[in-house]
């Protein structure tokens, strides 16, 4: 899923080239390239599909030439994650009704790729022959207020007292739990209570379910969305598909998959995992994933000199020389003709400043 605009990462991320297409970490690969790469031993490249805005088609083809052009699906407008998932699921289902699907954002990072691949492999085994939805829950390491949370069911593994089992124990994934509830982004005190209580996981927005289950669930829970694709589906794999998509996709409800399905379905399970995940949603989160110098400065750029600076994050990927003196706890970011200098604690205002 690669249609977002990454507005919190301005000026590095812009509507013309959002963060999923940028070498955020300064390692020579964009986030979408890293995303496709970490699936490459689990899912063959011929089974990779990209859903993005039609304005990003050329960027996707340039950065991922190995993905067949026919598997780059173009949204004529933004309609959130539920229409995105319905679009690609219905198209795959039309030709491959037994398909097992993984949905992943294109702009996240994973530090422990080997563990990630093992989790995905186990997840696909779990969902292959079950009518369930599996979501990955990240083990929380701090009381984070920037993520939604997943509450795992706390029932015991026993039926001696007539209690229904809430855990599906399998040889491949014995720690998979039924989901009790999805929680919105909490305040700090609530986030602390989640950590103290246990059984709460960060919602990574990574979902695994088979194509039949996607089609059935959305038809039951979001019939107005399903009806749009009932109209579109006969034109899949025909020359008229782009025209029909442009005509009907804008009529889809603007709704997230979390609100449309995950919070309502009774068949959602969570797989707790720990593979160094971050959604890189803010400059602050990027700072924690970059190497830091002896003064806790993190920088991405070819020619940066920091003098008497502390706790700063600097992202200036151009070749121009950058000299910064005397700043503490600042964000310095440059892109094309725009330069941002702001205090870290004020970064939530960045979305407003770019308007």
Question: Which role does the model predict for each range below?
Answer:
Residues 8-11, 15, 25-105, 111-121:
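Conserved N-terminal catalytic core of the sugar/cofactor nucleotidyltransferase
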């Amino acid at each position: 899923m690669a249609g977002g605009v990454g507005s919190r990462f301005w000026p590095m991320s812009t509507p013309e080239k959002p963060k999923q297409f940028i070498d955020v970490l300064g390692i020579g690969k964009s986030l979408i390239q890293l995303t496709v790469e970490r699936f490459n031993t689990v899912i063959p490249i011929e089974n990779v599909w990209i859903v993005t805005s039609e304005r990003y088609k050329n960027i996707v083809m340039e950065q991922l030439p190995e993905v067949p052009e026919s598997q780059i699906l173009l949204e004529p407008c933004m309609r959130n994650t539920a229409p995105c998932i319905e679009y690609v699921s219905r198209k795959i289902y039309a030709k491959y009704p037994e398909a097992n699907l993984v949905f992943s954002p294109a702009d996240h990072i994973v530090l422990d790729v080997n563990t990630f691949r093992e989790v995905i492999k186990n997840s696909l085994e779990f969902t292959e022959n079950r009518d369930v939805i599996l979501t990955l829950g990240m083990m929380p390491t701090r009381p984070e207020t920037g993520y939604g949370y997943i509450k795992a069911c706390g029932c015991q593994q026993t039926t001696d007292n007539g209690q229904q089992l809430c855990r599906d124990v399998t040889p491949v994934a014995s720690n998979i739990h039924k989901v009790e509830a999805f929680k919105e982004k909490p305040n700090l005190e609530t986030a602390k209570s989640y950590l103290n209580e246990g059984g709460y996981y960060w919602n990574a927005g990574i979902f695994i379910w088979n194509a039949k289950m996607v089609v059935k669930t959305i038809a039951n829970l979001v019939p107005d969305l399903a009806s749009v694709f009932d109209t579109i589906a006969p034109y899949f794999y025909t020359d008229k598909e782009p025209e029909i998509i442009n005509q009907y996709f804008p009529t889809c409800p603007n709704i997230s998959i979390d609100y449309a399905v995950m919070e309502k379905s009774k068949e959602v399970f969570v797989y707790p995992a720990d593979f160094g995940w971050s959604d890189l949603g803010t400059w602050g989160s990027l700072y924690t994933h970059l190497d830091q110098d002896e003064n806790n400065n993190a920088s991405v750029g070819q020619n940066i000199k920091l003098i008497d600076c502390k706790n700063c994050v600097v992202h200036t990927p151009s070749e121009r020389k950058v000299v910064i003196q005397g700043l503490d706890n600042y964000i310095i970011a440059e892109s094309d003709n725009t330069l941002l200098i702001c205090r870290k604690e004020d970064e939530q205002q960045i979305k407003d400043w770019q308007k």
